[in-house]
A protein has these predicted regions:
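Active-site-adjacent loop and "lid" segments of alpha/beta metabolic enzymes
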Residues: 1-26, 38-184
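Alpha-helical structural signal with a strong bias for long, charge-/Ser/Thr/Gly-rich
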Residues: 30-31
């Protein structure tokens, strides 16, 4: 069974078991728990679709891989090995299936990584706060998904999920949530 992401997904990072449950109920499909085993277990119990394990470097992959295997994670972030497309190539060369590698890029690099055939993770948040920051993150998320990003990292989960649903409906890759027809 292939685990390729069929549509865009929302990722968030959590630091407590309570945050893991809250993220799952808010609609996050992918949760980055770092290398905290208690969070890994909590996230798996929350039935989040995908778990990304380990913020580490190449030296950490032997330590993080058993954690990922014990938790049932199928998607390893290419940043485990160093980040970017070269790390993804190294991971594929080391025997990790391409459909299990998630490449973390900047918004400007989404198109190139997607065209190269990788599943793409992009962080759309910035350091600003408030409604303007949420709107900007939503706009960035929509453009990134249109260009091929599979996973969006954000702290604005519900708002970004709505933006992604709208973008996928416009693109034709998902039906609209509701259709309204009328005469103007």
């Amino acid at each position: 069974m292939s685990h390729s992401l069929q549509s865009s997904a929302v990722l968030t990072t959590v630091f407590t078991v309570e945050q893991a449950a809250e993220a799952a109920s808010a609609g996050a499909q992918i949760v980055d728990a770092g290398d905290d085993e208690s969070l890994v277990i909590a996230i798996r119990h929350a039935r989040v679709d995908v778990l990304v394990c380990g913020p580490g470097s190449a030296a950490d992959i032997s330590r993080d891989s058993p954690l990922a295997a014990r938790s049932g994670a199928w998607l390893l972030s290419a940043r485990l090995l160093c980040g970017g497309l070269s790390a993804a190539e190294q991971a594929a060369g080391a025997g990790i299936a391409r459909d299990r590698i998630l490449v973390q890029v900047t918004p400007a690099e989404v198109g190139a990584a997607s065209r190269a055939g990788w599943q793409v993770l992009v962080d759309v948040d910035d350091d600003a706060a408030g409604a303007a920051a949420e709107a900007a993150a939503g706009a960035r998320a929509s453009v990134c998904v249109w260009l091929g990003a599979n996973v969006i990292s954000t702290r604005h989960i519900a708002q970004i999920r709505r933006c992604l649903d709208m973008t996928e409906s416009i693109r034709g890759s998902r039906p609209p949530a509701w259709a309204v027809r009328g005469l103007a």
